[in-house]
Amino acid sequence: MKKLLLLLLAAILALGCAACAAKPYAPAGEGTGNVELDEQVLALLQELCDPKADLVTNLGAVYDFLCTGITYRATLADTSGGFTDELTNSLALELLQKRRGNCDAQAALTAVLLRRMGCEARIVQGTFLRADDPTPVEHAWVYAVVNGTGCWFDPLYGGHFAENPRDYFMADDARMALTHQWDAAAD
């Protein structure tokens, strides 16, 4: 009888614990429509984001991953026609699969992740300056609207050139203008 009661109690506790288990992160934004990309994006967000944390905290976790979990590889992408949804999705998927890519791919993945998290996000093209070289370098990064405020994300620059990578996380115009140039009329 004691064994039966203990088994019953263990079963009740197991069911109760399963009901109390933390729910996975559920992003607020919509997917891209590319099934493979959307599955990988959701899996990554569920790995990186805390369902109990606020949006900015989770954006920080995603940004930190982009700064440290992706390797820069100098390649060329044909962006002469702009960042169409097809190009953005293709670059983002390739970067997720290989974990290495150029600034275009990093900007594409950043935009896809931010959109999936419920933020407006668009890729911006321009140039940046390195401290050791006055020659402008062609570059791409992301402008987003987070909680109603416009800000900039550049995990490639932050992770490779900045003294403090977080300087390019939700950066304001003044911060970005120190190192980046873009067509402000396009904003």
Predicted regions and their residues:
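Positively charged n-region of N-terminal signal peptides that target proteins for export
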Residues: 1-4
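Active-site nucleophilic cysteine motif
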Residues: 58-62, 99-114
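Short, low-complexity, Pro/Ser/Thr/Gly-rich segments in the mature regions of secreted, periplasmic
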Residues: 176-187
